[in-house]
Amino acid sequence: MKNNVIAISRQYGSGGRELANILAEKLGYKLYDRQIVHMAAAQLGISGMSESQLKEFEDNVPPLSLKFMPFYIFGMSGAKPMNHKMFEQESEIIRRLAKDGNCIILGRCADAVLQGNENVCSVFVCANDEYREERGRTVYDGKSVIELNQEDAKRAEYYAYYTGKEWGNPKNYDLSVNTSHKSLEDIADVIIDYINKK
C-alpha cells in the first residue's frame, strides 16, 4: 500500500503550521518542517549553522535571471553554489520521507518535488488580511501585514526560482483553503475528507 503524503504551502500568518499539527494529530501522520533543513545541512557538512543563519542562507535566493547562466550554476570552479546543493539535498530527503511512511511536509516546495505522485495531496493555505493581521499580532510577535507579506514575497521568490512555478496559484495545488472564516479543526476535516475520497 502506498503512503499518503500531504504537502502544505501557506501564507505567513494563515495558520498553516497549526493546521498541519492538527492534521498530524488527527491522522497519526509524522510532520516534517524545519527538520528537513537541518537534515540537509548535516548531510552537507554545515550543521554548525544556527537556525537564524540557515534562515538567512535560504532567503538569499539569486535573481531568477541568473538561474540558467552556466557561470552561475556551476561557478568558475565548476562547483554548484551551496544554495543549489541545499535545495537538491532537501528534495532528496523529501522524496525519501514520502517513501518511508504517511507524513505531512510543511513548505520546502514539497508539492513540486513530489509532483506526479498520485498519493500526494498538495494544499495551499491562505487567509484574508484581517485574519493574518490578528495572528501577526498574537502569534508572531506583533508582525504587521506588511511584514507578513514581505515573508510571503521571499517564499514566492524561492518557490519560483527552484520550481519555475507561481507560488500560491490555485492551479498548482490539489486544494486551496481559506482559514479566515472556518476553524482550523473544520478545515482539517475537509482536507481529510478530500484525501479519503481521492
Across the structure, where does each feature detected by a protein language model lie?
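Short beta-strand-centered segment that lines the nucleotide-binding/catalytic pocket of NTP-utilizing
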Residues: 30-42
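Extreme N-terminal starter segment of soluble prokaryotic enzymes
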Residues: 2-5
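Short, amphipathic alpha-helical "lid/cap" segments that border enzyme active or binding sites
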Residues: 91, 184-192
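Glycine-rich phosphate-binding P-loop
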Residues: 8-21
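RNA pseudouridine synthases
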Residues: 97, 110-116, 137
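ATP-dependent small-molecule kinase phosphotransfer cores
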Residues: 41-102
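Small-molecule kinase domains that catalyze NTP-dependent phosphoryl transfer to phosphate-bearing small molecules
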Residues: 61-67, 142-185
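Conserved phosphate-donor/acceptor-positioning beta-strand/loop module used by diverse small-molecule
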Residues: 116-150
